[in-house]
């Protein structure tokens, strides 16, 4: 038969134990460490007779899948052993004496405490109260029997004058923290996966016949290639250094320039792609510009990336480059993801306002600067300024594109 044992004072559950119905009660008590002098055992809501322990489980009325409940004989003293005595209506002297009485009744617990001369102090009431009393009272004050889990002294002070502004602020703080703790317990019980690390999205592709594991990041504006990958794939000669500058995020990184177009191979499909070449440990990042251009679809249900009618699976965690995982936690990763391009004073300004801009951008009439500047949202202007352009350039671009930030950014990068 299968028997399960539960303890009332700790909610611990033992079993189920697979036992023979011919097993004696005394053997069962030894198995579950039942102490008759301090505990009571119940079966089917009735106290089990422990006077005759030589009878079998079958003779005692136990059946398959039954549960036994073990309760302490003296709830107050038992809970005191676990640091949670019944201290309601107990004075400090009564509380200390209750603890001493429990240790007298449970010498094994006294031995586990490991205090020198404890046995002598237990038998000397005055010495026990003088030496251990302050320690027990300190623990009693730190323990809480209130919904906020704070010391009872603080809880009593707050509840004695709840209309006081200071107390109200503290109660509000405790209430909010209690709700947060409840949410945490709920999340850990029902959505434990939210506390685990999620694998990033990588796919396999080829550039000039070289296999590459590319990080797919729809949160990055631009597609990035590292300088080492550009060298390995023989694309260094195609870097337009007029687009060099500084990538600024948490830290800074050097932008060597831009590769305007090259082909990448995903399965049997060749796709044109442009890259910003950045000095970063991450080899390659597929940003939103390339994903939008080829109308890519990130299918998390099937764990694939659909692009140009081709499905390519995302790599399992075991195949993700370890150095790239480290790169995602460094400041350089933030530079790559945000792609907040800021030109330095020496080369960046020439890169963005050089010959390429003179050819592709129409010249702004000089009278424009004297006209009243249309009012655009400060957040839109800031987005363009964060890309490395001056406030004046940002406003002019917004003026030309009717306030569309995306079009304005494209215009400025031409």
From Swiss-Prot:
Locations listed in the record: Cytoplasm
Domain UBA: 375-414
Region Disordered: start-end pairs: 342-372
InterPro entries cross-referenced by the UniProt entry: DDI1_N (IPR033882), Peptidase_aspartic_DDI1-type (IPR019103), Peptidase_aspartic_dom_sf (IPR021109), UBA (IPR015940), UBA-like_sf (IPR009060)
Any GO BP: protein transport
Keywords: Aspartyl protease, Cytoplasm, Hydrolase, Protease, Protein transport, Transport
Catalytic residues, chain numbering: 217
First-tier enzyme category under EC: hydrolase
Listed EC numbers: 3.4.23.-
Pfam families: Asp_protease, UBA
Cited SMART domains: UBA (SM00165)
GO cellular component: cytoplasm
Annotated ranges, domain Ubiquitin-like: 1-77
GO molecular function: aspartic-type endopeptidase activity
Family, similarity comment: Belongs to the DDI1 family.
Complexes and interactors: Binds ubiquitin and polyubiquitinated proteins.
PANTHER family: DNA DAMAGE INDUCIBLE 1 HOMOLOG 2, SODIUM-GLUCOSE COTRANSPORTER REGULATORY PROTEIN -RELATED
Protein purpose: Probable aspartic protease. May be involved in the regulation of exocytosis. Acts as a linker between the 19S proteasome and polyubiquitinated proteins via UBA domain interactions with ubiquitin for their subsequent degradation. Required for S-phase checkpoint control.
Name of the featured protein: DNA damage-inducible protein 1
Organism (species): Kluyveromyces lactis (strain ATCC 8585 / CBS 2359 / DSM 70799 / NBRC 1267 / NRRL Y-1140 / WM37)
């Amino acid at each position: 038969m299968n028997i399960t044992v539960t303890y009332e004072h700790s909610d611990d559950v033992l079993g189920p134990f697979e036992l023979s119905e011919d097993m004696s009660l005394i053997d069962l008590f030894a198995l579950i460490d039942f102490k008759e002098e301090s505990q009571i055992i119940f079966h089917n809501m009735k106290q089990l007779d422990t006077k005759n322990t030589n009878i079998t489980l079958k003779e005692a009325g136990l059946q398959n899948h039954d549960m036994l409940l073990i309760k302490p004989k003296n709830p107050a003293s038992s809970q005191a052993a676990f640091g949670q005595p019944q201290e309601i209506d107990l004075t400090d002297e009564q509380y200390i004496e209750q603890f001493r009485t429990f240790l007298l009744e449970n010498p094994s617990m006294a031995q586990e405490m490991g205090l020198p001369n404890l046995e002598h102090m237990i038998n000397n009431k005055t010495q026990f109260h003088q030496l251990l009393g302050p320690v027990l009272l300190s623990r009693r004050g730190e323990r809480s029997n209130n919904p906020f889990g704070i010391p009872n002294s603080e809880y009593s002070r707050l509840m004695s004058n709840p209309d006081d502004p200071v107390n109200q602020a503290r109660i509000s703080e405790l209430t909010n923290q209690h709700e947060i703790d409840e949410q945490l317990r709920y999340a850990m019980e029902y959505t434990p996966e939210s506390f685990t690390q999620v694998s990033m999205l990588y796919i396999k592709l080829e550039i000039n016949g070289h296999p590459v594991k590319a990080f797919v990041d729809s949160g990055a504006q631009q597609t990035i290639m590292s300088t080492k990958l550009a060298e390995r794939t023989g694309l260094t000669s195609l870097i337009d250094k007029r687009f060099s500058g500084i990538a600024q995020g948490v830290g800074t990184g050097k932008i060597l320039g831009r590769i305007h177009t090259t082909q990448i191979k995903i399965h049997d499909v060749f796709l044109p792609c442009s890259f910003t070449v950045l000095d970063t440990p991450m080899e390659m990042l597929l940003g939103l510009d390339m994903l939008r251009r080829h109308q890519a679809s990130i299918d998390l249900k099937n764990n694939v990336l659909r692009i140009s009618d081709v499905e390519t699976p995302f790599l399992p965690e075991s195949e993700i480059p370890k150095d790239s995982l480290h790169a995602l936690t460094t400041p350089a990763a933030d530079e790559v993801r945000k792609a907040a391009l800021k030109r330095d004073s020496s080369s960046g300004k020439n890169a963005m306002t050089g010959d390429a801009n003179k050819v592709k951008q129409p010249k702004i009439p000089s009278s424009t600067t004297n006209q009243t500047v249309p009012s655009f949202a400060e957040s839109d202007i800031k987005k363009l300024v964060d890309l490395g352009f001056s406030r004046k350039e940002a406003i002019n671009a917004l003026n030309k594109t009717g306030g569309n930030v995306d079009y304005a950014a494209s215009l400025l990068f031409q």
